[in-house]
Swiss-Prot record:
Lineage: Bacteria, Bacillati, Cyanobacteriota, Cyanophyceae, Synechococcales
SUPFAM superfamilies: Aldolase (SSF51569)
Major localization class: cytoplasm
Annotated catalytic residues: 135
Record localization: Cytoplasm
Protein name as annotated: Transaldolase
Record pathway: Carbohydrate degradation; pentose phosphate pathway; D-glyceraldehyde 3-phosphate and beta-D-fructose 6-phosphate from D-ribose 5-phosphate and D-xylulose 5-phosphate (non-oxidative stage): step 2/3
One GO location term (cellular component): cytoplasm
Organism field: Prochlorococcus marinus (strain MIT 9211)
Cited function: Transaldolase is important for the balance of metabolites in the pentose-phosphate pathway.
Pfam families: TAL_FSA (PF00923)
Length: 339
């Protein structure tokens, strides 16, 4: 009998949720996703130091000899995302998702400008727009930024999605893909209800993604649904048939070593009816988010987590560039690093 991973791959596009190139080579997914936490983790692996140094040197050339370490590192944050994305694309046939700085999540214009810059860097590296998804947090401001970018031919992946109103707004904005989270929803319910275990079909995260998937397909939205943030393979099994599922290497390994029959649970050609299209304006969006403690808390937590990962990556890059440039003429006194 085929493994769960092989069976799943026949009905759903499997995406690797990692910046680890070795894991991507092992599991051979079609697409891959990254986020600030994954990039930070990869940046601490000795084998990837060459990629980090490449980005820092390229950033120094871009900023110029008299630019401060801080200016170089700010530039390098974008360069590193693209350097890792470029390497990932060498090992997959599909798309890589690269995330906009989470600290811009409530600034539409800054998000648009950052996304345009990331795409310019990819294009400069010879990579076309159709192989890149720009990840943006599913705030109202982020969704509006994605609407602008999609009109420009820049494809977006709206992440940190926990409430149905976020999904509906994304569909109306015409975004390419959304990443509704499963495991983080489960985490919240386990912590706040006193219920320690939820069977797969009753998992609140599974229920959320299933509703979104059927709503999109019933109403003929083109936006793809990619379930994300899994805690166990039972959640993945319950979403078999979803457009895409982005899965960590640990769970990909479990799927590849489990040999039981897999039933297709979601069918884009025969979706279950879940109601007519709903209009989501800014006021309704904020009202629905504010009345959903889980979604409000998890969106806030996710943005803070990714923002901290960027802060931590900046510190590591400042330390690294100081080592690389120590004693050189452009390591000016004004570049001193403060912790």
């Amino acid at each position: 009998m085929s493994s769960l991973l092989e069976q799943l791959s026949s009905m759903t596009i499997v995406v690797a949720d990692t910046g680890d190139l070795e894991a991507i080579r092992t599991f051979k997914p079609r697409d891959a996703t990254t986020n600030p936490s994954l990039i930070l983790a990869a940046a601490q692996v000795p084998g990837y130091q060459k990629l980090i140094d490449e980005a820092l040197k390229s950033s120094r050339e871009e900023i110029g000899i008299r630019g401060s370490f801080q200016e170089v590192v700010k530039e390098a944050l974008d360069q590193i995302c693209v350097v890792f994305g470029k390497e990932i694309l060498k090992n997959i046939p599909g798309r890589v998702s690269t995330e906009v700085d989470a600290r811009l999540s409530f600034d539409t214009q800054a998000t648009v400008e950052k996304a345009r810059k990331l795409i310019r860097l990819y294009n400069k590296a010879g990579i076309k727009n159709d192989r890149v998804l720009i990840k943006i947090a599913s705030t109202w401001e982020g969704i509006k930024a994605a609407e602008v970018l999609e009109r420009e031919g820049i494809h977006c992946n709206l992440t940190l999605l926990f409430n149905f109103c976020q999904a509906a707004a994304c569909a109306e904005a015409g975004v390419t893909l959304i990443s509704p989270f499963v495991g983080r929803i489960l985490d919240w319910y386990k912590a706040n209800t006193g219920i320690a275990n939820y069977p797969g079909p009753e998992d609140p995260g599974v229920i959320s993604v299933t509703k979104i998937f059927n709503y999109f397909k019933s109403n003929n939205y083109k936006t793809e649904v990619m379930g994300a943030s899994f805690r166990n393979i039972e959640e993945i099994v319950e979403l078999a048939g979803c457009d895409l599922l982005t899965i960590s290497p640990k769970l990909l390994d479990q799927l590849s070593n489990t040999n039981v029959p897999l039933e297709k649970k979601l069918d884009s050609l025969n979706p279950k009816p879940v109601g007519q299209k709903i209009d989501i304006d800014h006021e309704k969006f904020e009202s629905m988010m504010n009345s959903d403690s889980m979604a409000f808390e998890k969106l806030d937590e996710g943005i803070k987590k990714f923002s901290k990962a960027i802060d931590d990556l900046e510190i590591r890059l400042l330390e690294r560039i100081a080592i690389l440039e120590e004693g050189k003429s452009f390591a000016l006194s004004g570049n001193a690093i403060s912790s």
